[in-house]
Regions:
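Short, acidic, small-residue-rich periplasmic hinge/interaction motif at the N-terminus
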Residues: 1-35, 73
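Extracytoplasmic beta-strand/coil segments of soluble accessory domains associated
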Residues: 26, 43, 47-84
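A beta-strand signature from Gram-negative outer-membrane beta-barrel systems
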Residues: 99-139
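Periplasmic-side early beta-strands and strand-to-turn transitions of outer-membrane beta-barrels
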Residues: 129, 136-138, 151, 155-231
Length: 231
């Protein structure tokens, strides 16, 4: 400078490297992979991954825990778009995978073991990241074998005059299976409702604003005891 005072020059250099290019291995399951697998809930997808042990306490929608490489279930960090969503209302911060259905999920990233270390100490056994990014193909889908087992999901995206990218995803899944009690007459079912809103706006070539809203509600039937079908 003109006065000869020492100063520090700060310059920016874009970092184009990604985690997997820095020696971190992750398994990516795309929307196309999910559709090809015929999966209904996230458990159907994760069962395809070696090294993940899935324990479900009943039919679809019941409490489900995942154990990775012999570690406790709460040692696996669960994220939504990079934000931790483990249930902190429980003692160990467990995540119930039985509540997760895949109709509004765009991609699943799985980091096993030390590959999840960059997420912090909560990811001792690894991390699972659910991505609900914008899908620019407007679709809707209805499927059902009968009135007791059916699903509906839709995706709609619009780019307005102010260059806002607005996206809505919604889904409803209903499944009624056989009774958990042998020779029982009551169907124990599950109903899942999901809404996902995404908004993106590019401020300039290197900066963008991104916001997401995700809501889910799962109700599952269960039997009170081995002789009582009401739960």
């Amino acid at each position: 400078n003109k006065k000869g005072v020492p100063c520090i020059t700060v310059s920016k250099t874009p970092n184009t490297s990604s985690f997997n290019e820095q020696g971190i291995n992750k398994i990516v399951i795309t929307k196309q992979d999910i559709l090809k697998s015929g999966a209904i809930d996230i458990n159907d997808v994760l069962k395809l991954i070696p090294g993940l042990d899935i324990f479900q306490s009943g039919q679809m929608g019941q409490q489900t825990s995942i154990f990775s490489r012999g570690s406790e279930s709460n040692h696996t960090l669960v994220l939504l778009n990079g934000i931790a969503i483990n249930d902190q209302s429980t003692t160990d911060g467990l995540h119930d995978f039985g509540q997760d259905f895949i109709q509004t999920i765009q991609q699943v990233e799985i980091y096993k073991g030390s590959n999840g270390a960059h997420f912090g100490p909560s990811a001792i056994a690894g991390a699972i990241n659910f991505i609900t990014d914008i899908d620019y193909i407007n679709t809707y889908s209805v499927s059902g074998f009968n009135f007791k087992n059916n699903s509906f999901d839709t995706n709609y995206t619009k780019i307005n005059d102010n260059n806002w990218h607005l996206n809505f995803k919604g889904s409803v899944v209903q499944s009624e299976t056989d009774s958990a009690i042998a020779k029982g007459n009551e169907n124990d079912g599950a109903r899942n409702f999901q809404i996902n809103l995404n908004a993106i706006k590019w401020i300039n070539e290197n900066l963008k604003f991104k916001s997401t809203l995700y809501s889910r509600n799962t109700k599952a039937d269960y039997d009170g005891s081995a002789s009582n079908e009401t739960g």
